[in-house]
Amino acid sequence: MIQDIQPHQFDNQYKPCPPDAQSYALYYEGQSALLKKRKDGIDFPRFRDLERLNEEIYEEAVYLFTIDEERFYLVQNISRERLSEFTMENKESFRYAEPQYLAFAGITGYQLNNWYRNRKFCGRCGHKMRRDEKERMMRCDHCGNMEFPKICPAVIIGLTDGDKILMSKYAGRAYKKYALLAGFTEIGETIEETVQREVMEEVGLKVKNIRYYKSQPWSFSDTILMGFYCDLDGEEEITLDREELALAEWFRRDEIPVEPSRDSLTNEMIIKFKNGEV
């Protein structure tokens, strides 16, 4: 999956040390990131590439994380028109970009950029917030409100019936490939209850034997994904929620129209079932 960057080591401990000329500078506009496309993959600008465009870039940078010995920072206020070798590319390109550790850095930085951008002012009193010196947190000095990075719990559901698995396609989304049922956890429910509710809401089916598989940070949607397999409890007849899904179909293992990819928990769960590993 996209976070599996071994032998590289990701360190998200907040240690706001200043950048140097070799540090990576991550810059975003909307859903796009500034990067360089090379024959062997992508690369991000370093501070040495940007210092001529903004003399205060070192002072304004926000520490994000470290991969191996490489430090990554968030930067703003860049005249990118003067950076002809770099282009703005949509965040979706990080799903398959190489090298994988830089793709993971790019999408993780994107999540943090959105959080910082959306937490400039306090949601309780409206005053300006500031970055905390010791933790990755935004603090309001006026009312004491503290905001931590947005991470939404959600489930991916591999619903099976013997040698068949239920696969679906989203309604009204750009992503048109087959996926598994999925949804966000609501207030006051357990993760297992989320699985039961989402299956009932989206396809009108009951489930049993819910069992945890694996989790994945999914910065594309500020989410921590938790994968579960479960068994059908009752008849296979589907009642489709057409606001959420364009279709939902049962597939036998040898009929599954999905090939392995390295990015998502959903794909890994489908391929595990396809190969008879679960």
Role assignments for model-derived ranges:
Residues 108-158:
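Cys/His-rich short segments
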Residues 179-214, 228:
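The catalytic Nudix box helix
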